[in-house]
Amino acid sequence: MHMKTYLFVFLLFISLISKGQDSLDDLLGSTSSTNKPISTTFSSTRIVTGHSVEMIPKGVGEFRISHRFGTIEEGFYDIFGLDQAKIRLGYDYGITDNIMVGFGRNSHRKVYDIFAKFSFLNQTIDNSTPITLQYLFASSMETLRYGIKIPFMQRFAQINQVLVAKKINNLSLQIMPSLMIHEYDSYDNNIFTGIGGAIRYLVGKRVAINLE
């Protein structure tokens, strides 16, 4: 599998989605009030570190600073993992209400990444559409210098995720079947599958418990 093939398929997919977006927006705009999508399945476009089904509105940009702390076993010596923190700086943008893109840079292994997220179904107030369904594509490139030469293509990775979410009163549930591809040489198994899950429970107007 080669990076050029994935890039071609990805660009073709964006083109097809963009052409159909105006018609989709017209249909969504013509629905009744009870058919409108529900709001705030999750509090943000991210749950903890992974993507939620929330989207940035059309024409809106968002600069994000994300932290992932280390382990707490060293206690006060490294301030319970604070000294080991990894930081990602990123920018997200809403092309339409149903298409969102972004890019960023992570201090861990000096990784640069891009992503695109597409919304196909939105859970409605009257539950005529019972779930929210989205597709996420992300690609990353590691730029950390090693003592040995690493082939350029082996620095890339891609992930494909289907995001399926359901909001029931104060409880939100999401599952994320995933396919990850590392560009190792052809003798290695470079395709991995998995499934993730997330829960959000609203305990107050501005307080929620998130698990991922």
Explain the meaning of each model-derived region.
Residues 4-10:
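Sec-dependent signal peptide recognition
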Residues 11-13, 47:
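Short linear sequence elements within intrinsically disordered, low-complexity coil regions
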Residues 15-17:
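N-terminal signal peptide c-region/cleavage motif recognized by signal peptidases
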Residues 21-148, 155-160, 166-173, 180-181, ...:
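Transmembrane beta-barrel domains of Gram-negative outer membranes and organellar outer membranes
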Residues 153-155, 189-190:
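Active-site glycine- and acidic-residue-rich loops that bind
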Residues 183-195:
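Short helix-loop boundary/capping segments
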Residues 196-200:
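Generic long, charged, amphipathic alpha-helical segments
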